[in-house]
Amino acid sequence: MIKPESSPPAEKAAASALKRGRTRAWAWWVAAGLALAVILSGYVRCFTKYGDLTPLIRFGSEFDATVVPSIRAQPHHVQNGDGFDGQFYTQLGTDPLLLKPETPVAMDNTSVRPRRIMLPVLTWLLSAGGQAWLVLWVYPLLNLAAWLALGVVTWRILRPMGNDVAVGAFLAIVLGPGAVESASRAVTDLPAFMLAFLSLGIAGYGGAVVLSLAALGRETTLLAWPGRMGELARWPTSWRRWLLDGAISVAPLAVWMVSLQLRFGSGGAGVDGGNLGLPLSGLFTRLKEIASHLSAQPVASVSDLLLHPAIQCGLLIVSVLTQLIFLLKNPQRNDALWRWGVLAGTLGLCLGWATWEAFYTVTRHLLPLHVAFNLLLVRSENRAVWFWLIIGNLHVLPRVLYWVDFH
């Protein structure tokens, strides 16, 4: 009887590759399950503790007297102080065109808040014409929908790459602090970012229409427009097309802003909403604050260390600078995401103290930089890819812990 020959090297290599492929497939499903569990955890914790999702909206006691009557009549959580921006966008969900006299009175700024009309209009449509009890549920859940969309799109982009770095980048993007910050404060950044992100993959003027909707959610998403301009070498022969594309992207926001200016004036804020300052001024001011925070608030445990404001801010600064340095060090000028990420990172250096004071607000502005860094890192041939991945995402874990422990 002839004994079967052992498998040749090629077959062994194929079997080994198949085994690694199965391992990667399981890793992807585990990563997806982990990401979904983290995303839902904050919402579940909020609901089980308060009975609804209004703590995410962050109504503040300082504005309680001016809340629109339809919202005031509904049970909702009110925190001490001035709350946060989501409270104004939620109220716009009952009257997005500000046709009722009480709506402008409820705004802290009649220029900036109504300018970002996209989510309030969507809330109004999904809440049967602005039914207040539905608005209080629909509005905070729009960030959940955008968050899940980010996960699906990122999964579809990264999974075919089939390597371990891609799994890490997937988790870093989906659980990134910009997404956490947008969801935990029920603001417009993540939904607007997702529309702008999707516009990069839509050819023709349809993509410009989608980008115009994103701009009505957050003006800075217009920084994605250069990413729609194709290869740089073709710009001179396509300038008429790109000008029309840009006009379509900008026109709805421009018309709406002019309308608000004519109706309500400047509202006490400039075009930037008070977010910008001299380059690096906000960053340097925040660096000075880190030392004083460390001395004022002692660290008692590892958890305290990760959640310590000064430590979180320090990790955030290191991560953001690492991401921007990587993109500048590895230029891909014909890549849509690279252009958007670099422009967003440059804008981030010009954010003033009004943004850096609540320092994780910065991560919402820098969502394009964060996503571009992680996606382009996976595609790069850099030998130190794991070093860049870890250092560029040091700020992810502290915000994940904050979200999971939402209170």
Question: Model-predicted segments: where are they?
Answer:
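Membrane-lumen/periplasm interface segments of specific transmembrane helices
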Residues: I39-P55, P226-L232, S238-G345
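Short hydrophobic/aromatic helix or loop-helix immediately within or flanking a transmembrane segment
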Residues: G83-P101, A106-Q131, P368
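Membrane-embedded glycan-lipid processing machinery
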Residues: S111, R115, L126, L134-A145, ...
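Transmembrane-helix motifs of polytopic, lipid-linked glycan transferases
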Residues: V121-L125, L141-M161, L321-F326
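Transmembrane-helix signature of polytopic, membrane-embedded enzymes
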Residues: W133-W137, T154-L175, F193-M194, D335
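Hydrophobic, aromatic-rich transmembrane alpha-helices
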Residues: G151, D304-N334, L349, L367-R379, ...
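Specific aromatic-rich, kink-prone transmembrane helix
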Residues: V153, L171-I173, P191-G207, A372
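Membrane-interface alpha helices of multi-pass inner-membrane proteins
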Residues: A196-F197, Y205-E231, S249-A251
